[in-house]
C-alpha cells in the first residue's frame, strides 16, 4: 500500500486592485523600463531601445508573477485585435461585396469585397468580376466559409460584424480587469492540470461541439437547399431551423427521433446527418459537410474526455509532474525529470514548444486546404487556393523560427543547470557537437546531391543530350516511396472504411476527377522525377534552416569560442573590443540568419506548388471530358533544370504582373515594383557598417548646426543588431510582397 501525503487543493487565487489604472504613466515614455525612465531621450538610440524593450517584459521586472500577468493581459489585447479584424472582414462583406450575387452563381461570378473610390483614376482597379459588379477580386476565402456557415444574406454579415466588435470591447475590458482589478496569482498560471482540463474540454471540446451543433442545425439544411438550386432568398433563416424542428425533419427524416437513437446506441439512424463518405461533393467541389459535421462531433467527444484526464481537487487523474518524471528509457539518464519545473517557471520554454507545434500545424493546414478543400467552391477559386497555401506556408515558417528564438531566450535567461542534471535536455546540450556536426554533414550531402542533379540536367540540356538527363523520359528517378504512399491511401479505405465512397483526398490517385462549372476542382496528382528533384531541394533548405536555428539554441549559453556567452545575453554584436572573430555569434544572430534560410525554404515550396498545380491539376474540361491544364503539363519536363525554373516559371509567368499597367491588376504591378525597391533597400542595412553611417550623420548634423536647425535629440547610427533587424525585416517584407504580387497577377489573369 502506498501512503501519500494529502495533496494541496487547487484554489483560484486572485489579487484585488494590484495596480492603479493611471493615464499619467502613458505621458512618461519608457516608464516600464528602469534604464529608460531614468534618462531623458538624449539620442535616437533611446527611441530604438524604447521600441525594442516595450514588450520584453523580462527586462521590465524579474518578478515572474508580474511578467505572467502582463502576458495574460496582452493576450486579451491580441484577441481584441483579432475580433476587430474579423469584424472588418464581415463588414466589408456586408457593405462592399457581391456576396449575394456570388451565392446565386458561384461558378461564373468572382468574389469581391472592396470597391475603390474614384479620386484620380484609381477606379481602374475595379475589375469586372461578373454579374455587372466592379470591384477588387478578393482571395481570402471568406465567401466559401460564409456559404459553409449557412450565411445567406449581407444583413447576417452586418449582424456578425457588430457582434465581433462587441466581443472586441469585452476582450479589452477583460485585459484591463485581469491586470488592474483582479489579477491572478502566480500559482494560478502554474496550475497546469487545471489549465489542461479547461483548455481541452472548454476551448477544444465545447468549441468543437458547438461548431458541430451549428453545422448540423444550420449549415447542413441551408447548404443542402443551396446545392439543390433553391434561391437564397427563399431559404428559411438560421434561427428558423433551430426553433422549428419540422423544417429539419422534412430534409432529414431521422431528426424526428431526437436523441432516442443516441441513447439506445442505434447510431446508424443518424447516417443522413453524420456521414463517412470521403472525397468531395461533386456539386461544390468541397468536402461533404455531413463528413465535417461528423468530424467535429468526434473531435468534441475526444477532447471532452481529454479534458477530464488531469488531477485537480479530486484524487484521480494524471499528474503532469509524475508523467514526466516516469518518462525514462534505458539510455536516457534521468529522462524528463526537471522538465516540469522548467515549463512551469519559464514561459519562454513553454512558448518555444507551443510555437514549434503551432508552426508545424500551420504548414499542415496549408497542405490540407488544397488536397481536402473544406468549403464549397473553394477548389475552383484558384487564386484563393494559391493565396491560402502561400499564406499558411509563410506564417508557419515564421512561427517555427520564433520557436527557436524563444528556446534560445529560455536557455540564456531561464535555464538552471543544477535542476537539469543528466536529464534529456542536459544530455542534448552535452551532445551538441555530435548533433550539429552530423546535421552539418547531412546539409552538405543534401546540398551537393540535390543541386548537383539540376546542374547535371542543365549541362546535358545545354549539350543537346536529353537522353542523359534525369527525367521521366530518360534516366528516371521516380519517387517510389511517395507513389507507394499514394497507392496505399487509395486502396486502404476499402479495408479500413468499407462505407466510404472515396479516399480521404482525390490527390492520392484512383482516377476520379471532380469538376465544377467546367473547371477542375481536384484530380489525382501524378508524381515523377521532377518532384523527386525538387523534394530534395526542400529537404536541403529545411535541414539548413534547422541547422542554423538549432546551433543557435544549443550554443546559446556557451561555446568553445565564448565560454561565458550566457553573461552577454540573448543579443549582442561581438564579445567586446579586443576579441576579433566573435561577432554574429549571439542567439539572436542565429535567428537572424535562420530567417533568411526559412525564406529560401518557403520560397521553393510555394514556387513548386504554384507551378505544379497550374501544370498538372488546375484547368478546364471540355464537353468531351478532355482536361486542358493552365500550363499544359510542362512541369515534368521543364522543372528538371535550373534554366527551366527561370525561363518557364519565373519569366514566363511574370508576364502578367509586368504587363499589368492600365488594367485592373495594375496595383499588383506597382506592388511588384515597390516591393523590389523595399527588398533592395534592405541590402543597404545588411551590407554596410555602423561607422560609415555615423560619419555621414555627423556631417549632416554639422550642416544643421550651421543653419541653427540642429535637433535636441542627437542622431546616432543604428547599432549593429538594430541595423540587421531593420535589414532582415525589409528583406522579408520586400521578398514576400514581390512574390504575392507575382502570384496573384498571374493566377487572376489566367484562371
From Swiss-Prot:
One of its GO terms (biological process) is photosynthesis. It is found in: Plastid, Chloroplast thylakoid membrane. Phylloquinone binds at residue 693. GO terms for cellular component: chloroplast thylakoid membrane; photosystem I. It is a multi-pass membrane protein. The keyword Membrane applies. Keywords: 4Fe-4S, Chlorophyll, Chloroplast, Chromophore, Electron transport, Iron, Iron-sulfur, Magnesium, Membrane, Metal-binding, Oxidoreductase, Photosynthesis, Photosystem I, Plastid, Thylakoid, Transmembrane, Transmembrane helix, Transport. Chlorophyll a' binds at residue 676. P700 is a chlorophyll a/chlorophyll a' dimer, A0 is one or more chlorophyll a, A1 is one or both phylloquinones and FX is a shared 4Fe-4S iron-sulfur center. The chain crosses the membrane at residues 71-94, 157-180, 196-220, 292-310, 347-370, 386-412, 434-456, 532-550, 590-611, 665-687, 725-745. InterPro entries: PSI_PsaA, PSI_PsaA/B, PSI_PsaA/B_CS, PSI_PsaA/B_sf. Its EC number is 1.97.1.12. One of its GO terms (molecular function) is chlorophyll binding. [4Fe-4S] cluster binds at residues 574, 583. Signal peptide: none annotated. Its main location: plastid. It catalyses: reduced [plastocyanin] + hnu + oxidized [2Fe-2S]-[ferredoxin] = oxidized [plastocyanin] + reduced [2Fe-2S]-[ferredoxin]. Chlorophyll a binds at residues 684, 692. Pfam families: PsaA_PsaB. PsaA and PsaB bind P700, the primary electron donor of photosystem I (PSI), as well as the electron acceptors A0, A1 and FX. PSI is a plastocyanin-ferredoxin oxidoreductase, converting photonic excitation into a charge separation, which transfers an electron from the donor P700 chlorophyll pair to the spectroscopically characterized acceptors A0, A1, FX, FA and FB in turn. Oxidized P700 is reduced on the lumenal side of the thylakoid membrane by plastocyanin. The PsaA/B heterodimer binds the P700 chlorophyll special pair and subsequent electron acceptors. PSI consists of a core antenna complex that captures photons, and an electron transfer chain that converts photonic excitation into a charge separation. The eukaryotic PSI reaction center is composed of at least 11 subunits. Belongs to the PsaA/PsaB family. This is Photosystem I P700 chlorophyll a apoprotein A1.
Amino acid at each position: 500500500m502506498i501512503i501519500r501525503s494529502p495533496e494541496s487543493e487547487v484554489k483560484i487565487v486572485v489579487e484585488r486592485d494590484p495596480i492603479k489604472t493611471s493615464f499619467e504613466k502613458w505621458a512618461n515614455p519608457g516608464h516600464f523600463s528602469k534604464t529608460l525612465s531614468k534618462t531623458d531621450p538624449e539620442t535616437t538610440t533611446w527611441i530604438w531601445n524604447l521600441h525594442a524593450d516595450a514588450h520584453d517584459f523580462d527586462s521590465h521586472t524579474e518578478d515572474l508573477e508580474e511578467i505572467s500577468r502582463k502576458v495574460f493581459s496582452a493576450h486579451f489585447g491580441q484577441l481584441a485585435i483579432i475580433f476587430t479584424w474579423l469584424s472588418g472582414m464581415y463588414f466589408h462583406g456586408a457593405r462592399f461585396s457581391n456576396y449575394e450575387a456570388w451565392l446565386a452563381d458561384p461558378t461564373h461570378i468572382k468574389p469581391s469585397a472592396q470597391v475603390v473610390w474614384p479620386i484620380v483614376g484609381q477606379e481602374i482597379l475595379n475589375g469586372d468580376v461578373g454579374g455587372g459588379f466592379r470591384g477588387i477580386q478578393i482571395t481570402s476565402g471568406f465567401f466559401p466559409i460564409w456559404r459553409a456557415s449557412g450565411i445567406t444574406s449581407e444583413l447576417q454579415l452586418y449582424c456578425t460584424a457588430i457582434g465581433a466588435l462587441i466581443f472586441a470591447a469585452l476582450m479589452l475590458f477583460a485585459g484591463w480587469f485581469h491586470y488592474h482589478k483582479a489579477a491572478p496569482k502566480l500559482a494560478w498560471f502554474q496550475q497546469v492540470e487545471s489549465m489542461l482540463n479547461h483548455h481541452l474540454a472548454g476551448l477544444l471540446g465545447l468549441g468543437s461541439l458547438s461548431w458541430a451543433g451549428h453545422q448540423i442545425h444550420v449549415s447542413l439544411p441551408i447548404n443542402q437547399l443551396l446545392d439543390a438550386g433553391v434561391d437564397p432568398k427563399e431559404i428559411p433563416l438560421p434561427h428558423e431551423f433551430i426553433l422549428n424542428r419540422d423544417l429539419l425533419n422534412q430534409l432529414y427524416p431521422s431528426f424526428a427521433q431526437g436523441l432516442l437513437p443516441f441513447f439506445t446506441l442505434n447510431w446508424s439512424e443518424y447516417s443522413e446527418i453524420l456521414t463517412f463518405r470521403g472525397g468531395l461533393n461533386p456539386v461544390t467541389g468541397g468536402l461533404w459537410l455531413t463528413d465535417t459535421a461528423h468530424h467535429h462531433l468526434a473531435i468534441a467527444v475526444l477532447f471532452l474526455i481529454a479534458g477530464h484526464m488531469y488531477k485537480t481537487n479530486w484524487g484521480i487523474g494524471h499528474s503532469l509532474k509524475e508523467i514526466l518524471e516516469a518518462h525514462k528509457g534505458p539510455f536516457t539518464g534521468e529522462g524528463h525529470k526537471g522538465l516540469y519545473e522548467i515549463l512551469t517557471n519559464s514561459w519562454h520554454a513553454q512558448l518555444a514548444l507551443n510555437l514549434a507545434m503551432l508552426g508545424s500545424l500551420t504548414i499542415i493546414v496549408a497542405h490540407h486546404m488544397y488536397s481536402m478543400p473544406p468549403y464549397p467552391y473553394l477548389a475552383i477559386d484558384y487564386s484563393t487556393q494559391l493565396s491560402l497555401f502561400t499564406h499558411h506556408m509563410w506564417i508557419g515558417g515564421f512561427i517555427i523560427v520564433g520557436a527557436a528564438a524563444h528556446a534560445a531566450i529560455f536557455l540564456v535567461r531561464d535555464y538552471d543547470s543544477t535542476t537539469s542534471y543528466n536529464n534529456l535536455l542536459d544530455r542534448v546540450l552535452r551532445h551538441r557537437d555530435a548533433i550539429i556536426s552530423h546535421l552539418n554533414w547531412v546539409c552538405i550531402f543534401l546540398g551537393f546531391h540535390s543541386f548537383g542533379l539540376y546542374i547535371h540536367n542543365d549541362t546535358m540540356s545545354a549539350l543537346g543530350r536529353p537522353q542523359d538527363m534525369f527525367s521521366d523520359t530518360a534516366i528516371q528517378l521516380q519517387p517510389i516511396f511517395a507513389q507507394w504512399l499514394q497507392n496505399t491511401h487509395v486502396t486502404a479505405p476499402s479495408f479500413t472504411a468499407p462505407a466510404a465512397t472515396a479516399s480521404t483526398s482525390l490527390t492520392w490517385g484512383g482516377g476520379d476527377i471532380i469538376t465544377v462549372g467546367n473547371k477542375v476542382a481536384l484530380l489525382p496528382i501524378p508524381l515523377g522525377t521532377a518532384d523527386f528533384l525538387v523534394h530534395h531541394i526542400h529537404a536541403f533548405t529545411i535541414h539548413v534552416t534547422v541547422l542554423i536555428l538549432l546551433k543557435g539554441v544549443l550554443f546559446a549559453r556557451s561555446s568553445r569560442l565564448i565560454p561565458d556567452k550566457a553573461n552577454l545575453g540573448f543579443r549582442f554584436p561581438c564579445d567586446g573590443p579586443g576579441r576579433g572573430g566573435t561577432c554574429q555569434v549571439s542567439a539572436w544572430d542565429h535567428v537572424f540568419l535562420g530567417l533568411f534560410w526559412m525564406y529560401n525554404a518557403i520560397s521553393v515550396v510555394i514556387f513548386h506548388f504554384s507551378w505544379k498545380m497550374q501544370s498538372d491539376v488546375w484547368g478546364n474540361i471540355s464537353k468531351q471530358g478532355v482536361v486542358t491544364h493552365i500550363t499544359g503539363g510542362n512541369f515534368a519536363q521543364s522543372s528538371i533544370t535550373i534554366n527551366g525554373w527561370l525561363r518557364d516559371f519565373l519569366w514566363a509567368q511574370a508576364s502578367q504582373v509586368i504587363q499589368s499597367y492600365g488594367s485592373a491588376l495594375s496595383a499588383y504591378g506597382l506592388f511588384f515594383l515597390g516591393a523590389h525597391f523595399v527588398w533592395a533597400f534592405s541590402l543597404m542595412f545588411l551590407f554596410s557598417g555602423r561607422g560609415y553611417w555615423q560619419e555621414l550623420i555627423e556631417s549632416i548634423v554639422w550642416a544643421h548646426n550651421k543653419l541653427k536647425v540642429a535637433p535636441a535629440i542627437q542622431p546616432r547610427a543604428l547599432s549593429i543588431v538594430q541595423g540587421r533587424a531593420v535589414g532582415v525585416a525589409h528583406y522579408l517584407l520586400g521578398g514576400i510582397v514581390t512574390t504575392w504580387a507575382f502570384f496573384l497577377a498571374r493566377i487572376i489573369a489566367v484562371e
